[in-house]
Structures are given as C-alpha cells and as structure tokens.
C-alpha cells in the first residue's frame, strides 16, 4: 500500500487492486493491499452474490478510513452483482434499491470515494427506454440522498454486452446519464475488459484513445473516476466477461500504456480484477506501474 503523505505526491494514476476483506476491512484488506504494493483499493461491503446488508465493524471501519487517509490511498466499494434497476421483477428492483443504498452508506462510513454498480439489463423482453425510465424512478432518489460532502460518487460500470444490457458501448452511457439528469454525484467506472468485449477494439496505435474520446464526448469531462484494468481472455466484440492478467490477453500491454497518457485519465486510479492469487495480483500491479512510469 502506498505510504504517500499527501495527494500532491500521488502518481498520475494510482494502481491497486480489489482486495479480500473477510476477517476485517483493515486487518485483512489493507494487509493484502500492502503485499500488492497497492496505491488504491476496492472492496466489497456485502456478499457480492447476495442481498444481505450487513452492518460494518466500527473499529475496522475507522482503522480502514484512517489508514487510507494517512497513506493517500483512494478507496472504492463495488456493489453486489445482483443489483439490476432494469429488472421486470418488482422484488429484484426493491432489493436493488436497498442493496445500493447500503453500499453507498457503507462507502461513506469507510471513506470510499466511489461506489461501483453495474448498469444492468432490460429483462422480460422490454424495450430499453422502458427500463431506463424505471432506472430513473428508483436510482435518482438514491443519488439525491448523497448530500454530505464525504458521500461517495455513484460510478456506473458498463457490461460486456451480454443479453439485453442497458449499457455496454461508450455511447450507451448517454441515455443512462440523461435518465439520471447527469446528476453531479454520477460518474463512470470504465472496465477495459468489458468495453473491449462489447466491441471497442482497444488495440492498435489509437484504439484506446479513440474509445476514451468517445466516452468524454458522451458523458463530458470529469466523469471518468475509476478504471477497472483487466485484460480479456476473448477477442474484441465477443460479449464475454472473462478477465485475464495484464498483457496475457487479447488487449495486450500497449493499450494500458496508452490509457495512462490520455487527458481523461489524469488522476484516475486503476484497480485490477484479474485472475489468480496474491502473487498474480502483485505482478499485475507491478506491470501496470511499469507501463505508467516508463
């Protein structure tokens, strides 16, 4: 974990990873982060494949928050995967509201800068505008609850384009942002594997920069607040969400180097969600730092 003493000493793009927290946010999560030499961290605050909304451990929360602040380590929460505000099932939508509210409140408690949520899909054979109207009805009130200075941003993460995805290509963020009134607490988490799988070929001399240009054209400057840096086991446009270690997949190293030179990514942390255990994660963090630092 970074030991930088002030934000001015942070690298252009802090590089870190998603860390396990079973046993304690601070005692387990940040210990793992230190072994990765992570400069940024992402955590779950609930079972990512369930609906439970557990209370935090105040001592662990405080220790985590203080350690991240002292080390200038940006922290993020990833909301559970089951959340889908576009679902045709009322119970799923209601649970999605409570689950995301829990993640946002827990995010504030631990000092997280953002809470990442998947953009979901229009289930039940419904048209996208119908599902987006439902997204507005249920997600916008949650954004309006973010009235504290230390509330996290809500970061939308697009999908690989499977099924009736509401948001997979860069331009799909447009209708999503419009549905949510381009709320000031709304941002984007760009997953490189997802956007590649959805059809944006990031390879080649300008693939990454062109994709980032499209994103900025769609949502405006300053909305990109986190990057999930993952290579892809599958080719561009395969619509498969299968992450690979950095440089070992179809994206390759060069696009990640290019990513860290685009104006839109200045100051934006990179978090890996790649396969393997601690050793592989540490290698991916080191590889991205090397690409960043030249």
Curated annotation (Swiss-Prot):
Reactions that this protein is recorded to catalyse: Endonucleolytic cleavage to 5'-phosphooligonucleotide end-products
EC numbers: 3.1.21.2
One Gene Ontology biological process: base-excision repair
GO molecular function, one term: phosphoric diester hydrolase activity
Keywords: DNA damage, DNA repair, Endonuclease, Hydrolase, Metal-binding, Nuclease, Zinc
PROSITE patterns attached to this UniProt entry: AP_NUCLEASE_F2_1, AP_NUCLEASE_F2_2, AP_NUCLEASE_F2_3, AP_NUCLEASE_F2_4
Keyword Lipid biosynthesis: no
Homology family: Belongs to the AP endonuclease 2 family.
Name the record gives this protein: Probable endonuclease 4
Native source species: Streptomyces coelicolor (strain ATCC BAA-471 / A3(2) / M145)
The gene coding this protein: nfo
């Amino acid at each position: 974990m970074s030991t930088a003493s002030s934000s001015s000493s942070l690298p252009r793009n802090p590089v870190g990873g998603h860390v396990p927290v079973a046993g304690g946010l601070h005692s387990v999560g940040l210990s793992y982060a230190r072994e990765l030499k992570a400069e940024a961290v992402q955590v779950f605050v609930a079972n990512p494949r369930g609906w439970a909304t557990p209370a935090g451990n105040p001592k662990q929360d405080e220790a985590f928050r203080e350690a991240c602040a002292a080390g200038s380590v940006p922290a993020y929460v990833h909301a559970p995967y089951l959340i889908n505000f576009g679902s045709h099932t009322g119970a799923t939508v209601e649970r999605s509201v409570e689950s995301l509210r829990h993640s946002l409140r827990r995010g504030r408690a631990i000092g997280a800068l953002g809470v990442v949520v998947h953009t979901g899909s229009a289930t039940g054979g419904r048209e996208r505008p119908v599902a987006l109207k439902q997204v507005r009805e249920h997600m916008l009130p949650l954004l309006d609850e973010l009235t504290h200075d230390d509330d996290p941003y809500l970061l939308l993460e697009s999908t690989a384009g499977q099924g009736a995805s509401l948001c997979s290509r860069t331009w799909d963020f447009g209708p999503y942002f419009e549905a949510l009134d381009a709320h000031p607490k709304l941002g984007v988490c760009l997953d490189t594997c997802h956007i590649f799988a959805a059809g944006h070929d990031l390879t080649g001399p300008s693939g990454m920069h062109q994709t980032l240009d499209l994103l900025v054209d769609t949502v405006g400057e300053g909305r990109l607040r986190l990057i999930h840096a993952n290579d892809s086991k599958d080719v561009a446009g395969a619509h498969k969400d299968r992450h690979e270690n950095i440089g070992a997949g179809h994206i390759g190293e060069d696009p990640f180097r290019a990513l860290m030179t685009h104006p839109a990514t200045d100051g934006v942390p990179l978090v890996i969600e790649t396969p393997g255990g601690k050793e592989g994660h540490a290698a991916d963090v080191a590889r991205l730092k090397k690409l960043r630092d030249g």
